[in-house]
Design a protein with these regions (language model features):
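Active-site glycine-centered loops adjacent to acidic/histidine catalytic or metal-binding residues
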Residues: 98, 110
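Mid-to-C-terminal Rossmann-like scaffold of FAD/NAD(P)H-dependent oxidoreductases
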Residues: 111-217, 266-298
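C-terminal catalytic lobe of FAD-dependent flavoproteins
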Residues: 53, 61-87, 163-250, 261, ...
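A short, glycine/Asx- and small/polar-enriched loop/turn
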Residues: 47-53, 101-102, 160-161
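A Rossmann-like FAD-binding core segment of flavoenzymes
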Residues: 2-96
């Protein structure tokens, strides 16, 4: 294997993890033998005979190396439109139809700032699922349809030595302009490297962090994306008890039972269909999920 040194300007994954989960991720990396140097930046990459030999840091010290991997994040290239007044905070501003300040010019993907569902304002959420959906919406509107984009949420998924980490929406309220308006709930199981955090505002989920145990991560993402009021179960979500099961069951049943559901405009098929709520299948799913969850935590 390789001897790895990681240079970070402040802390590990600071843009998506809060302080506690960042420290846990750092600990997992260090257990793998990775040396982490924090609060330092690169001044120069030195070479000998055309090959990398060392990295000089901003304090003048050097880190000998034979390979450099650069992963400094995403910076939208806005030069094409920077003189048009169409720049938002970090990217090209678009409306709900993916139009820029010029109605016949559309933009989508990592270069744009779109409506962020959890933040309730424009934000640059640069990831593949968002870019893919935005591209489809932009294409439909360019072709003459009038299809609004519902908005995006930030989401990052990684794994460190088999320990999964998922970050959704707002994960560090203190970094937000209105940080005091948020409420958080946290669950920790230290011996299993488990850390879970939910972020609320006005009884709606705005973000979540899952480390080591994904639990109902998919359901949580859906609650954030749809901005479902969760006040009645807010204090019990992380316990994953019957109150959460019942809430999710009722939500699913209300959405599906007896309704004719239209495929989204971006789907190839546009044929509506009826879909009923299967009580037996849902009960079996709940039972299987609880059994699997209990086995995982006993290990």
């Amino acid at each position: 294997g390789l001897n790895v040194v990681m240079l970070v300007r402040s802390r590990v994954m600071r843009r998506v993890l809060d302080v506690e989960s960042s420290a846990l991720a750092e600990s997992l990396l260090q257990r793998e033998g990775i040396e982490i140097i924090k609060s330092r930046t690169v001044r120069e990459i030195k070479g000998i005979n055309g090959k990398v030999a060392a990295v000089m840091l901003d304090n003048g010290s050097e880190v000998p190396c034979s390979l450099v991997v650069v992963a400094t994040g995403v910076a939208p290239n806005v030069k094409l439109i920077e003189n048009s007044g169409g720049i938002a905070g970090r990217g090209i501003a678009v409306n709900e139809y993916m139009q820029t300040t010029y109605s016949n010019v559309f933009a989508a993907g990592d270069v744009t700032e779109t409506y962020d569902i959890s933040r309730e304002r424009s934000f640059n959420n640069a990831n593949w699922p968002n870019a893919h959906e935005q591209g489809g919406i932009a294409g439909l509107n360019m072709a003459g349809k009038r299809v609004p984009y519902r908005g995006s949420i930030s989401m990052n998924v990684i794994s460190i030595k088999g320990i999964p980490i998922v970050c959704i929406g707002i994960t560090d309220p203190e970094a937000e302009n209105d940080g005091l308006a948020y409420e958080t709930k946290v669950k920790r199981v230290i011996r299993h490297n488990i850390y879970q955090k939910l972020v609320f505002k006005d009884n709606r989920l705005k973000g979540a962090i899952f480390v080591g145990d994904l639990g109902y991560c998919g359901a949580i993402k859906n609650l954030i994306q749809e901005q479902t009021p969760v006040g009645i179960i807010k204090n019990s979500i992380l316990n994953e008890g019957y109150q959460l099961y019942g809430f999710l069951r009722k939500k699913r049943q209300t959405k599906l039972e007896g309704n004719t559901i239209q495929w989204p405009e971006t789907y190839m098929s546009q044929t509506p269909y009826r879909k009923g709520f299967n009580e037996k299948s849902w009960t079996e799913r709940e039972r299987g999920q609880r059994k699997w969850r209990n086995q995982e935590l006993i290990k």
